[in-house]
């Protein structure tokens, strides 16, 4: 078994959709980024790539490449899953945490889990997503951004 960790953060700004875990979350702001800025899926992709010692999303999907402008992170997650399969691995388990003061994530968690499980072709019981706040502290606490971290375990297929 191999394990990787991932972390991502994006700034909250006006005039952007808030997409987390492939779910559009109604909110007054969205995350700024080259792609859809799905902070959760970015952390998960980095964790999977790290577990396979295949670098990070910046290497595979650089923000200098116009092909990835506005890209759907669920589609890129499928690409990462296919890449590790081509290297002889399969995803065993994912655990991720969204760190956001607002909006509340609880009502969206199950759909996020379903989206992730479908994208990487695993059962939902292999995917855990949870959310927490920073109790008003730091850039997340004052509503300037949202962060996520993830851990992935992979095994030989």
Swiss-Prot record:
A divalent metal cation binds at residues 8, 10, 42. Transmembrane segments: none annotated. Binds 1 divalent metal cation per subunit. Disulfide bonds: none annotated. Pathway: Isoprenoid biosynthesis; isopentenyl diphosphate biosynthesis via DXP pathway; isopentenyl diphosphate from 1-deoxy-D-xylulose 5-phosphate: step 4/6. The record marks 34, 133 as: Transition state stabilizer. Its EC number is 4.6.1.12. Keywords: Isoprene biosynthesis, Lyase, Metal-binding. PROSITE patterns: ISPF (PS01350). Pfam families: YgbB. 4-CDP-2-C-methyl-D-erythritol 2-phosphate binds at residues 8-10, 34-35, 56-58, 61-65, 100-106, 132-135, 139. The keyword Ion transport does not apply. It catalyses: 4-CDP-2-C-methyl-D-erythritol 2-phosphate = 2-C-methyl-D-erythritol 2,4-cyclic diphosphate + CMP. It comes from the Bacteria. The keyword Protease does not apply. Its cofactor is a divalent metal cation. GO terms for biological process: isopentenyl diphosphate biosynthetic process, methylerythritol 4-phosphate pathway; terpenoid biosynthetic process. One of its GO terms (molecular function) is 2-C-methyl-D-erythritol 2,4-cyclodiphosphate synthase activity. Involved in the biosynthesis of isopentenyl diphosphate (IPP) and dimethylallyl diphosphate (DMAPP), two major building blocks of isoprenoid compounds. Catalyzes the conversion of 4-diphosphocytidyl-2-C-methyl-D-erythritol 2-phosphate (CDP-ME2P) to 2-C-methyl-D-erythritol 2,4-cyclodiphosphate (ME-CPP) with a corresponding release of cytidine 5-monophosphate (CMP). NCBIfam families: ispF. PANTHER family: 2-C-METHYL-D-ERYTHRITOL 2,4-CYCLODIPHOSPHATE SYNTHASE, CHLOROPLASTIC. Belongs to the IspF family. Homotrimer. This is 2-C-methyl-D-erythritol 2,4-cyclodiphosphate synthase. It comes from Alkaliphilus oremlandii (strain OhILAs). The gene is ispF.
